[in-house]
């Protein structure tokens, strides 16, 4: 799941017509960064119309700027830099867990199993930070708010959508496999 998109967030509003933004102003969250989720970006250059936006990350930053929100790139900088090392460390711990028979051997699997929970907690924390640290100089004043972590929401005239992407599904599937491996290993150690 490291290379797959974990989550997507989209904004729709009347000033972003569906024929130009079929999925709204959409961004995709990966373990190592935020990517453009606009459909136009995935089409061939000669298919893109002049009035289509190519970078929804920049467009979302522009929208957020008007309410005084920090740019998306400000969030989770440390986490994104640490993600490759954490994945390797969690993988090494799981491999060690296959051979270690001492007390609390199962604990070596916990970080890899709980990875997506950590992602969601961190994601929710950053959304809270973004929604509660608004600049006073904003063109439009909104009260501090909690952006939608999961599901649909509303902020001013914008409808917001926030849902898992296929990377989250891969991560959950890997966790289920690890839980089954831990149960099998437990059975072996008790035999």
Predicted regions and their residues:
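Hydrophobic alpha-helical transmembrane segments
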Residues: 78-99, 169-178
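Long, glycine/tryptophan/cysteine-rich extracytoplasmic
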Residues: 3-77, 124-162
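A hydrophobic membrane-anchoring alpha-helix module
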Residues: 164-188
